């Protein structure tokens, strides 16, 4: 007889680990299946840091979810003793009419979020590491900062295990089908049944959700670490903010203070400037010309940052055509399958609240959280 569960969760990265935690916290009998080992670096939930912010330039509709996610950061830290968020402040820099600045200001204004607007002179005075041009401004948000992806995943796995979830690593799902009043899931090792299936596939969405009708694009991204020219002191969190910086051509970069000691530098990356790939074909080698392009770009806006190149790492974005998430009951299987995917390079800060939403959907079929923006049916006929 197949082992039977209330819910099977496919994928135990950021979203899946949070889903396993929230489901098991509510008493559900949970099985989690993961292709790789725990807290791996093959997908989208690694790299030491991810930006978190509330003045959200992508759309004001995200703000209520961010406010809840911030509450859950604290709950996770209290429950596990792991640091998952460092809120040391952040700036959104660009021309006043740039998406980064204008969109952030729109969300801050609509939701009455604490913020300050800084002109170029004030940016340079407050943050001497930054060198904006005279026509650039910044929205400063005190509650912006970073989340630590590996710690976040480890914390949610810890909580799920503590609450009785059964987590199987290096056991990927090979296929699933509807079965009686639920689902049947196959792996190379076994066959399992459950009343509900949750699929959090990350970059494997095009392979695992072919019947969803969403044209996902998987994009290779590169993260870089540099030793600043004059050491990391000026780049410590008390001196140097997280930032998203949009230039006159609309190119965005994002970066972090130095958080891991004097020898590990500071991290920076381009936002959505990668090449299309698959999890099987991604080039995980970072080439000299890529490092040079990053250093050249940063030498204009943060001149002291690109001193000595230390290391680089790759990850993958799973993009939707409109760059908004997919979180919903599966339209083709609305009674038994919940999906959370297509986070388009800006999802990790939402991990705790997405876990809560997924648990709502899987156990009750609905959620009080505002997720209308994330219905996959909006994309069913969209071009990739």
Swiss-Prot record:
Keyword Cytoplasm assigned: yes
Protein's name according to its UniProt entry: Monomeric sarcosine oxidase
Family recorded in the similarity comment: Belongs to the MSOX/MTOX family. MSOX subfamily.
Enzyme class: oxidoreductase
Cofactors: FAD
Gene Ontology terms: cellular component: cytoplasm
GTP-binding as UniProt keyword: no
HAMAP family the UniProt entry points to: MSOX
């Amino acid at each position: 007889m197949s082992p039977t569960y209330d819910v099977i969760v496919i994928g135990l990265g950021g979203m899946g680990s949070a889903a396993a935690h929230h489901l098991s916290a509510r008493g559900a009998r949970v099985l989690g299946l993961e292709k790789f080992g725990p807290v791996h670096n093959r997908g989208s939930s690694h790299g030491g840091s991810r930006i978190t912010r509330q003045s959200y330039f992508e759309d004001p509709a995200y703000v209520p979810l961010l406010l809840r996610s911030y509450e859950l950061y604290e709950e996770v830290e209290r429950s596990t003793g792991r640091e998952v968020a460092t809120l040391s402040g952040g700036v959104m820099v660009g021309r006043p009419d740039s998406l980064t600045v204008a969109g952030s200001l729109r969300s801050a204004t609509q939701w009455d979020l604490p913020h300050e607007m800084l002109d170029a002179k004030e940016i340079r005075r407050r943050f001497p590491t930054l060198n904006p041009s005279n026509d650039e401004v910044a929205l400063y948000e005190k509650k912006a900062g970073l989340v630590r992806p590996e710690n976040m995943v480890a914390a949610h796995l810890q909580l799920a295990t503590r609450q009785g979830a059964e987590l199987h690593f290096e056991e990927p799902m090979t296929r699933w089908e509807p079965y009686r009043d639920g689902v049947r899931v196959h792996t190379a090792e076994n066959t399992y049944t459950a009343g509900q299936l949750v699929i959090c596939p990350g970059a494997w969405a095009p392979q695992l959700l072919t019947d969803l009708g969403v044209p996902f694009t998987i994009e290779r991204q590169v993260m870089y670490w540099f030793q600043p020219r004059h050491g990391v002191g000026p780049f410590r969190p008390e001196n140097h903010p997280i930032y998203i910086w949009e230039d006159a051509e609309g190119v965005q970069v994002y970066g972090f203070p130095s958080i891991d000691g004097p020898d590990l530098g500071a991290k920076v990356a381009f936002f959505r400037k990668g090449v299309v790939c698959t999890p099987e074909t991604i080039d995980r080698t970072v080439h000299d010309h890529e490092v040079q392009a990053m250093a050249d770009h940063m030498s204009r806006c943060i001149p002291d940052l690109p001193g000595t190149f230390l290391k680089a790492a790759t990850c993958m974005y799973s993009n939707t055509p409109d760059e908004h998430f997919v979180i919903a009951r599966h339209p083709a299987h609305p009674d038994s399958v919940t999906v959370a995917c297509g986070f388009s390079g800006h999802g990790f800060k939402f991990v705790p609240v997405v876990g809560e939403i997924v648990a709502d959907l899987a156990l009750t079929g609905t959620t009080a959280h505002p997720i209308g923006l994330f219905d996959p049916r909006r994309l069913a006929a969209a071009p990739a």
